[in-house]
A protein has these predicted regions:
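Membrane-embedded transmembrane alpha-helical bundles that form the catalytic cores
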Residues: 1-322
Length: 322
């Protein structure tokens, strides 16, 4: 409930106004940022992971100190990766010595991450898509350049932070899981989501998609295509809403949910067809290009604050002025 309040501007503003009233402050000055809680999204995921496993009879073998350290582990607090409690505790208990090898490994990861985030991402942010340049740009070519810049900016920013988190964790004796694996080089959307924010996708697969599809098998909605559609669209909608309770994040989640379902149906159709096998290399190259552009178009909803502006940008990309 607290996560929903913090992610919803209207609810956060109402809660802030209520608390201001209790403290004899002016409720009219309430803002959603009053209740910002640094890293709470990832704290919530860790808590839900432990509670869900406990509900399923899988109690994490951790003492209180290990549990608190896991929940608020600083390097991965802001943007992940989302570690598993048992794996984290195993690293925490293992003998650890800070030696030259560890320093070299961690230092390399920190430097690479800093370069991605503070050099590449910051440079790309100067021309990446935003509300201001989206409203001003009329040329389809320039609009595509803005979208491409945003796609690579968000990757280098997020992957750079992850590299630094993994490097910092290594210095403390914790081997955080990898979170990115060349996502823009994947030939389909399913492989993209197995390579982008890997631990988030694994979390939703384990605690939402898999339980939901198991439940659907016992209902009337037990046809495979329908189960896949409901599972994928609901999972991606939840991931979108987790980023923020806005229409744009709903649209972004729906965009990816529909894309995943289309790929699932295509993969099922193409499986075992010898007539398509001889074009495997062409399909792979074409798939990389198509998948990247599908993801890049989806970033339009992610980058902009207004749904109508996002639709206008998508139209302008294809030479339609609305």
């Amino acid at each position: 409930a607290l996560l929903v309040i913090l992610k919803t501007d209207a609810l956060a503003t109402a809660a802030s106004a209520f608390l201001r009233g209790l403290n004899a402050q002016n409720p009219a000055q309430a803002a959603p940022t009053d209740l910002s809680w640094l890293g709470f999204s990832y704290i919530a995921f860790r808590l839900m992971h432990v509670l869900r496993d406990l509900h399923n009879g899988k109690r994490a073998n951790m003492n209180l100190r290990e549990f608190v350290t896991y929940v608020v582990f600083a390097p991965s607090l802001l943007a992940g990766p989302i570690d598993r409690a048992e794996r984290f505790a195993k690293d925490l208990r293992a003998p650890y010595a800070l030696n030259i090898s560890v320093l070299g490994e961690a230092g390399t990861r920190l430097v690479i991450g800093a370069f991605k985030k503070f050099v590449l991402a910051d440079a790309l942010s100067l021309m990446a898509l935003n509300a201001f340049n989206a409203a001003q740009t009329q040329s389809p070519l320039w609009m595509w350049l803005l979208v491409y810049a945003y796609a690579f900016r968000i990757f280098f920013d997020f992957a750079g932070y992850t590299d630094m988190a993994i490097g910092a964790g290594r210095l403390l004796g914790i081997k955080l899981p990898e979170n990115f694996n060349n996502p823009y080089l994947k030939p389909n959307l399913t492989q993209f989501w197995n390579s982008w924010h890997i631990t988030l996708a694994q979390w939703f697969r384990a605690y939402w998609f898999n339980p939901l599809t198991r439940w659907l098998r016992g209902t009337r909605a037990n046809s495979v295509p329908l189960m896949v559609f409901i599972g994928q669209i609901s999972t991606m909608l939840l991931i979108g809403l987790w980023h923020g309770v806005t229409l744009n994040f709903v649209a972004w989640g729906a965009w990816h949910g529909v894309g995943l379902f289309i790929h699932n149906r295509w993969a099922d159709f193409a499986r075992g067809r010898e007539s398509l096998a001889k074009y495997e290399r062409a399909f792979r190259i074409g798939g990389v290009i198509l998948t990247f552009h599908f993801v890049a178009l989806g970033w339009v909803f992610f980058a902009l604050p207004e749904f109508n502006l996002s639709l206008r940008v998508l139209a302008r990309l294809f030479g339609v002025n609305v």
